[in-house]
Amino acid sequence: FNRKEIKDHGEGGNIIGADPVGNVLIIDDVLSAGTAARESIKILESLNSTPKIFLVGLDRQEKGNGNLSAKKELENDFGIQVSSIINLDALIKYSQNNQSFHSYVVELEGYRSNWGA
């Protein structure tokens, strides 16, 4: 994973772990506006590796830098496949259909209304 600041001691550098080589799968917990994803992709490209797939647990389906979703912008700008385990629409639908999660529906829909693409 990438560091917030480049270190000149210990492992050093701006990433932790093995040097990425060839095609790379990026795994992250959440995709919001795509800022962290763009940063990771650029770091990997600067190390001469090729990010091919960006896999996230939750795609919040937020707008990226423009009117498109962050997912669509990443796909268009970097030619990378973006996949998620679940997205905000599915989470809302699940909450609507399950009594124990009904209390979250209004808040989730409000989030989508404010930030969604």
What are these regions (language model features)?
Residues 27-29:
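Active-site flanking residues adjacent to catalytic metal/cofactor-binding acidic residues
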